[in-house]
């Protein structure tokens, strides 16, 4: 198990502030191009840049966040202010690989890999939906006056997601500020850029 306190010290060493890291995207096997979509759910693929803060049992992890999400591949990268990668999670149809603190771990399940990071569970399967304002099947949802999700309670009751602000990115409304609360952790997410992507061969991004 990866100790969160050790990971926190590694992440925050020498840091006094955070700034968004640009240009850290990866090149997927299939060429992708930016597209506009009406809703986030219309995007077959997307990339996100923002900031992440995790608090748990007195520990705190702050990092820049880059996330590339496609039907066949995914990459989640956390970096320091100086651009140093402190966590890299990659996933394809063959399984997942986690690189952290100079070590590499592999598993068929990305969820099991991240569960080893600390005593709490980061909901990696649900996050791509919640971070784009989409409840999952069975979730309890409270809507705001514009009929956008304001509060989402996961189907198992373990997570509460509060969306405090929205923005328009790639033509679609997506959350800007989220707070995910669990009995063992609080996760704050800030989305600075969200870009819908489609195959460069002509797909328009709609499913």
UniProtKB/Swiss-Prot annotation:
- BP-aspect Gene Ontology terms: lipoprotein localization to outer membrane; protein transport
Top-level division of the source organism's lineage: Bacteria
Q: Name one GO cellular component term.
A: cell outer membrane
- Main site of residence? membrane
Q: Cite the CDD domains for this sequence.
A: LolB
Which N-terminal residues, if any, form the signal peptide? 1-23
Q: One Pfam family this chain carries?
A: LolB
The lipid modification S-diacylglycerol cysteine is placed on 24
Bilayer disposition of the protein: Lipid-anchor
Assigned keywords, A-Z: Cell outer membrane, Chaperone, Lipoprotein, Membrane, Palmitate, Protein transport, Signal, Transport
UniProt-listed InterPro entries: LolA/LolB/LppX, OM_lipoprot_LolB
List the subcellular locations: Cell outer membrane
The answer to whether the entry has keyword Lipid metabolism is no
Query: Where do we find N-palmitoyl cysteine lipid attachment?
Result: 24
The protein's job, in short, is: Plays a critical role in the incorporation of lipoproteins in the outer membrane after they are released by the LolA protein.
Q: Which family does it belong to?
A: Belongs to the LolB family.
Q: How does it assemble?
A: Monomer.
What name does UniProt use for this protein?
Outer-membrane lipoprotein LolB
Which species does this protein come from? Shewanella amazonensis (strain ATCC BAA-1098 / SB2B)
Gene that encodes it: lolB
């Amino acid at each position: 198990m990866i100790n969160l306190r050790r990971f926190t010290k590694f992440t925050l060493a020498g840091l006094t502030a955070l700034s968004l890291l640009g240009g850290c995207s990866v090149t997927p096997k299939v060429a992708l191009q930016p597209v506009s979509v009406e809703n986030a759910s219309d995007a077959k693929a997307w990339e996100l840049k923002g900031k992440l803060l995790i608090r748990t049992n007195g520990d705190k992890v702050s990092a820049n966040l880059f996330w590339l999400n496609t039907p066949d591949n995914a990459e989640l990268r956390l970096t320091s202010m100086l651009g140093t990668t402190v966590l890299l999670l990659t996933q394809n149809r063959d399984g997942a690989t986690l690189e952290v603190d100079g070590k590499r771990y592999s598993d068929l399940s990305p969820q099991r890999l991240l569960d080893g990071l600390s005593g709490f569970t980061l909901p990696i399967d649900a996050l791509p939906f919640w971070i784009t304002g989409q409840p999952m099947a069975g979730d309890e949802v409270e809507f705001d006056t514009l009929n956008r999700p304001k509060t989402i309670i996961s189907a198992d009751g373990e997570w509460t997601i509060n969306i405090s602000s929205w923005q328009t990115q790639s033509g679609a409304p997506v959350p800007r500020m989220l707070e995910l609360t669990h009995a063992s952790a609080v996760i704050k997410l800030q989305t600075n850029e969200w870009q819908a992507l489609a195959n460069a061969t002509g797909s328009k991004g709609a499913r």
